Amino acid sequence: MTLATTHESKAAVPAFAWVSIALLLLALQASILFAMGRVPICTCGYVKLWHGVVNSSENSQHIADWYSFSHVLHGFLFYGLTFLLFARLPLLPLSWPARLIVAMLIEGAWEIVENSPFIIERYRAGTISLDYFGDSIVNSVSDNLAMVLGFLAARVLPVWVTVMIGLAFEIMLALHIRDNLTLNILMLIHPIEAVKQWQSGPPII
């Protein structure tokens, strides 16, 4: 979302330092998940670049799946949110790399919470995700990287393009897997039986 990148202050920290911080955050996320008992890779014994079957035990176990689009959308939203909150602070304006680190912290924290026993059981009880037992570490880290991709894309794309892509993702996911970021949040916070029944149907497209 190119809200006004020309007004952003230039990062005083070298690019290598930002990359190092980002890698450390990913390593920390992976370490915490490992300490929580999450499996490094799919228990099937291999890693796929893409797994497109949502209602299966391998969903959220490989590098990318249909929910990766939702994590790209996280990046869109985090770019806009951090721009509004931090880009023009009078005392401490944050450069875009610093705001990306903030976004990675938020995404990483959510990945850890999402893989807690409480949230896993919440998904299984309140949604159609009966085969969901949490993410593999490689999938969780990949989700954070998908968010980074969305953040970087939002930085260079016009706002209207970012919004249109986000809407296209939501519509595509709703029609193909009967789920998306909006429905995911709704069913996690306040499950609705009618929505759950609708989600159990076959792909619309």
UniProtKB/Swiss-Prot annotation:
As given in the record, the signal peptide range reads none
Q: Where in the cell is it found?
A: Cell membrane
Q: How does it sit in the membrane?
A: Multi-pass membrane protein
Kindly indicate whether the keyword DNA repair belongs to this entry: no
Q: Does the keyword Membrane apply?
A: yes
Q: Which UniProt keywords apply?
A: Cell membrane, Membrane, Transmembrane, Transmembrane helix
Q: Where are the transmembrane segments?
A: 16-36, 66-86, 157-177
The terms describing its cellular component in GO are:
plasma membrane
Q: Name one Pfam family in it.
A: DUF2585
Q: Which InterPro entries match?
A: DUF2585
Q: Which family does it belong to?
A: Belongs to the UPF0314 family.
What name does this protein carry? UPF0314 protein bll0647
Organism per entry = Bradyrhizobium diazoefficiens (strain JCM 10833 / BCRC 13528 / IAM 13628 / NBRC 14792 / USDA 110)
